[in-house]
């Protein structure tokens, strides 16, 4: 659920009180580096929006799973795909089929500038693009809320489970129930 568990503070020097919440200390050298509850929430909001958008596109295409994922730009070039999936930034997929496309926008722009036939083909594809306005999509909010959990509240991640141990669904439900009692 993204809550830094304060009950673990007695067991770990990395978890410290931070006002009404807790933080996870990465380094306590000359400058303390810590992950705060607000940091976790910001990641949750960003990844939930991305994942919800992906789910809307999957629904439009009437597909349940993806065979491959290409991540573009500097973000896609530097992120560890396993941890992107652990966070739930991307849907479950064979990790060998997730890769970086590099500077896809720059490459596409060069191709369009230097090759007339390619430019014509790109223009044809652009005319076929269908805009999906997430703000008016009925399922967006539901997908967004479900995607707030790490990696996801209801979607399974069988490919990810092959490389890391995921919490059991009962563990997730028990944690959610205990958080409801706190409020």
Language-model region placement:
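Helical "lid/coupling" subdomains associated with nucleotide-phosphate turnover
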Residues: 1-183
């Amino acid at each position: 659920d993204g809550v830094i568990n304060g009950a673990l503070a007695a067991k770990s020097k990395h978890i410290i009180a931070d006002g009404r919440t807790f933080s996870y200390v990465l380094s306590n050298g000359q400058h303390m580096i810590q992950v705060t509850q607000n940091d976790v929430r910001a990641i949750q909001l960003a990844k939930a929006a991305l994942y919800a958008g992906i789910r809307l596109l999957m629904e439009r295409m009437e597909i349940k799973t993806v065979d491959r994922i290409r991540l573009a730009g500097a973000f896609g070039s530097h992120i560890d795909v396993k941890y992107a999936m652990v966070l739930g930034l991307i849907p479950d997929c064979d990790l060998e089929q997730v890769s970086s496309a590099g500077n896809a926008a720059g490459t596409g722009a060069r191709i369009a500038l230097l090759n007339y036939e390619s430019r014509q083909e790109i223009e044809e594809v652009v005319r076929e693009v269908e805009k999906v306005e997430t703000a008016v999509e009925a399922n967006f909010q539901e997908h967004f809320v479900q995607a707030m959990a790490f990696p996801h509240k209801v979607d399974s991640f069988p490919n990810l489970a092959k490389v890391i141990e995921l919490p059991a669904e009962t563990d997730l439900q028990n944690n959610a129930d205990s958080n409801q009692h706190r409020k």
